Amino acid sequence: MEPLEPMRPVSVAVDTRTKTPLWKMAVLYPAVTSVFMFAALTTRTGIGLVVLGLVIFAVGASTYAMSERRMLRENSGVRVPYFAGPPVAPRHVDLLAAAGMPLLTSGAVLTVRASDTERPWVFISVFVIAMVLAITVPMVVHNVRVKRTESA
């Protein structure tokens, strides 16, 4: 038998993403979970809780929009895949996204439960459409702009 040729060295890219401090995750996750548990388990109704639900929804939507905007800015000039992670992801956990979407959902759940309406599916469908649009529209616009600059 002939001796095997030596293998070429393989270089692997170093993980340069920053780690999220543990104390931030230890504060964020129980807080968001508590808000969601309150929204899902409350049986009270009234205008005060509806307003609180709308405020939580607005905070979640704006937090998630900030996360989405930052992600698109970090990936400027690069197309972002719709069903996968972005090519440039400088952090392991994006706390804005980790708080934004659960708060958005919690606000929608609390608003629907506290309104005590006869047709909750109308509100639910509006909130679901808003959530889907909040996720997809900025990515579609970003990818169309990147495609235009690539073809020009």
Regions found by a protein language model. Give the residues of each.
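Cytosolic-side membrane-entry/anchor segment at the start of a transmembrane helix
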Residues: M1-L28, Y82, P86, M139-A152
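Select subsegments of transmembrane alpha-helices in polytopic membrane proteins
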Residues: K19-P30, A89-L103
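Helical transmembrane-bundle signal
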Residues: T33-M37, I56-Y64, L104-G107, M131-M139
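Alpha-helical transmembrane segments and their membrane-interface junctions
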Residues: S34-T45, A98-M131
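Alpha-helical transmembrane segments
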Residues: G46-A61, V126-A130
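Membrane-water interface of transmembrane alpha-helices
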Residues: V59-V78, H142-R145
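Alpha-helical transmembrane segments and their immediate juxtamembrane interface regions
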Residues: S62, I124-A152
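Loop-to-transmembrane helix junctions at the membrane interface
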Residues: R69-M101
